[in-house]
């Protein structure tokens, strides 16, 4: 496992949020049926993803969208 700077981790998270943020919010909205709660759940999803962002940067996560969706469902 490589060692990454905080800047690298933040850039990676920003990239994931840009690519998948809307999809995660929509899915959370379907599950929760409340857009305020869906926004909170989406935010929590990306916080949890950040805790494991090194795994994604190391290439251990092959399908980042599925990974994020699974985090959201478990949130």
Range-by-range predicted roles:
Residues 18, 25-29, 46-54, 73-74:
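Short amphipathic alpha-helical interface segments enriched in basic and hydrophobic/aromatic residues
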Residues 55-60:
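Short alpha-helix-to-loop micro-motif enriched in aromatics/charged/Gly
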């Amino acid at each position: 496992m490589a060692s990454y700077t905080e800047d690298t981790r933040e850039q990676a998270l920003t990239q994931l949020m840009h690519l998948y943020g809307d999809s995660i919010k929509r899915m959370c909205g379907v599950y929760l049926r409340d857009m305020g709660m869906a926004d909170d759940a989406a935010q929590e999803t990306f916080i949890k993803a950040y805790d494991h962002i090194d795994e994604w940067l190391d290439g251990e996560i092959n399908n980042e969208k599925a990974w994020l969706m699974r985090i959201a469902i478990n949130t």
